[in-house]
Swiss-Prot record:
Keywords of the record: ATP synthesis, Cell inner membrane, Cell membrane, CF(1), Hydrogen ion transport, Ion transport, Membrane, Transport
Record bears the keyword Isomerase: no
Database matches in InterPro entries: ATP_synth_F1_ATPase_gsu, ATP_synth_F1_gsu, ATP_synth_F1_gsu_CS
PANTHER family: ATP SYNTHASE GAMMA CHAIN, ATP SYNTHASE SUBUNIT GAMMA, MITOCHONDRIAL
Record protein name field: ATP synthase gamma chain
Native source organism of the sequence: Francisella philomiragia subsp. philomiragia (strain ATCC 25017 / CCUG 19701 / FSC 153 / O#319-036)
Oligomeric form and interacting partners: F-type ATPases have 2 components, CF(1) - the catalytic core - and CF(0) - the membrane proton channel. CF(1) has five subunits: alpha(3), beta(3), gamma(1), delta(1), epsilon(1). CF(0) has three main subunits: a, b and c.
GO molecular function: ATP binding; proton-transporting ATP synthase activity, rotational mechanism
Lineage, top ranks: Bacteria, Pseudomonadati, Pseudomonadota, Gammaproteobacteria, Thiotrichales
A Gene Ontology BP annotation from the UniProt entry: proton motive force-driven plasma membrane ATP synthesis
Family assignment from sequence similarity: Belongs to the ATPase gamma chain family.
């Protein structure tokens, strides 16, 4: 058993760590509130983009846009959104496990895989995988929002160009979904081809509405230019929304991880204090025994 001085030193060390984790919990809680505001602010834009792209796509169903229609799948791409920092529990590893299941299915079907990694954790993880080709990386920094958006647009352009050129035949995005402060879950969604996103019921409904003239658009220029630009904006909106939602998930997961660490530190301190009292009691008992033995010898 450790002596009393060692135990006191351990108690002080754990208390210092507890102060750090407590402060990190408060910082994460503050950042989480800001991240949730950003996430909620971008959602109406993403939903509007969804509605517009569905309507325009159905009204232009005969236009051969490369982003719209299925083709034989020989190679797929994944945009994986992770964090740049750790200390957020199992947020990243749960996401990687989720996307790896889908990647493994494609590899088993002899479909090659390209990855665009957003966040240093994803870049490091997928760089170690032999069967996966990392073609682009980017980072999101909430302190440099404009710079981060430019970097992410550059990485996204790499994937879009590969899809347009026929180098990949399908594009997915993997990120975390914010369910609540204490729950975040990984999700995988299709970005391209766009028609894969629509259910059969949506396709049927939109075709009927378009044929009946329930809605229509007047194009300032030709439909080709408008639809190409709109598809790119739609995909950028999806990625931007996923990144902001993932940022909220990161701060929520970090807050809970630091709270658990702070609570565990309290349990460790209580146990160390109990050990200290046992050692101190044993020392007192030993001293009393020595005094009694000395008195008996006299």
């Amino acid at each position: 058993m450790s002596n009393a001085r060692e135990i006191r030193s351990k108690v002080q060390s754990v208390k210092n760590t507890q102060k750090i984790t407590g402060a990190m919990e408060l910082v994460a809680a503050s950042k989480m509130r800001g991240a949730i505001v950003k996430m909620n602010n971008v959602r109406p834009y993403v939903e509007s983009a969804n509605t517009i792209i569905k309507n325009v796509t159905m009204a232009s169903i005969d236009y051969p846009n490369p982003y719209l229609f299925d083709r034989e799948v020989k190679r797929v791409g994944y945009i994986v959104t992770s964090t740049d920092r750790g200390l957020c529990g199992g947020l990243n590893i749960n996401l990687f496990k989720h996307v790896l299941k889908d990647i493994k299915k494609n590899l088993d079907d002899r479909v090659e895989v390209d990855v665009c990694a957003i966040g240093s954790k994803a870049a490091t993880f997928f760089a170690k995988l032999i069967d996966v080709n990392v073609v682009a990386t980017a980072h999101y920094n909430d302190k440099d929002n404009e710079g981060s958006i430019r970097a992410i647009r550059g990485a996204l352009k790499v994937m879009l160009d590969r899809f347009t050129n026929g180098e990949i035949d399908r594009l997915y995005m993997s990120s975390n979904q914010f369910v609540s402060t204490i729950k975040q879950k990984p999700k995988l969604q299709t970005l391209l081809p766009i028609q894969d996103i629509f259910s059969k019921e949506e396709l049927k409904t939109n075709k009927e509405q378009a044929s009946k003239g329930h809605w229509d658009y007047i194009y300032e220029r030709d439909i080709e230019e408008v639809l190409n630009a709109l598809c790119i904006r739609y995909i950028e909106a999806q990625v931007r929304g996923a990144i902001l939602e993932n940022a909220a998930c990161e701060q929520a997961a970090r807050m809970m991880a630091m709270k658990n660490a702070t609570d565990n530190a309290s349990d460790i301190i209580d146990q160390l204090k109990l050990d200290y009292n046992k050692v101190r009691q044993a020392m007192i008992t030993q001293e009393l025994a020595e005094i009694c033995s000395g008195a008996a010898a006299v």
